[in-house]
Amino acid sequence: MKRAVNCGLVKADNMKQAILLLSFGTPRQPSDLLPYLTSIRRGKIPTERELKVLTARYDAIGQWDNKLLQTMGEEQKKTLKSLLAIDAMYLAYLHMPNSMEQAIESIATAGYTSILCIVTSPFYSMIGTGAYERKLHSILRAYPDISCEIIKSWWNRPQFFEYWRSQLMAANPLQADTACIFSAHSVPTSTVGSYEDEVMSASNQIAKMVGLNHWYQAWQSAAPYGEWLGPTIESVIEQALIDGAKRIVCIPFGFVSDHVEILYDNDIICRNIVENAGATYERVPMPNGNTLFMEAMAKAIRERINK
């Protein structure tokens, strides 16, 4: 099929293509927490105690007064849209408005016949990117004239590694008393698939770029039920302290932005473990809308469109 170049991207003739950025979503006000958690739990309404616990966590990280935390997806969309130099860029959340249903309805109304989707999570897992994939397939049954592709992972791009290399190097990771702990979101052991191997491959590559001879891999933010991939970040921190570390540097490279699983699980829970042991806690900055980091996503999109 003949192809034509448009704004740095390539699309097939007679096909209008939209890019759909997919993200988890985050509550913007306390009243969002009930529908948000209910959606995460697939329609199961949380108990009053569960809501109280979650509210306390968001209160602790200053969620309700931090505009950037509330609009992170929009900021990432702006950066990605600028890098790709296109107008047909949409954003949808898995658990908050603007929902995936709303976004696809808007895309269809605008006349697009093809959608290329990318999830903010860099690694593919069945419960992560797979959840978006399954929901897309369900929604698109009502749109038989729209074709859809999803980029399942995009971590294996040089910009991804360069971002984390530069941030880790700035933390002086080679000091003798320092333990570097790489972490990604845990998943149920029954759904691991290739996720663990890909995450481990990435952490090994970052460590090699920095010159680390010894580091730790941990898994964090697991649900409080069922069997999840380990070791947990809490247990790894405790082991690093036993091994003699006086300074802990956390690298949550499986995540892309500041949110409750970083600002609470890492910066409050993990910090408390470290500081209660008399050691120093540090965490490298998250990418958020960093241009270098977002270029890894843009590169994956260009590659898919031009294949």
Task: Give names to the regions the model predicted.
Residues 9-307:
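Active-site-proximal alpha-helix that buttresses catalytic centers in soluble enzyme cores
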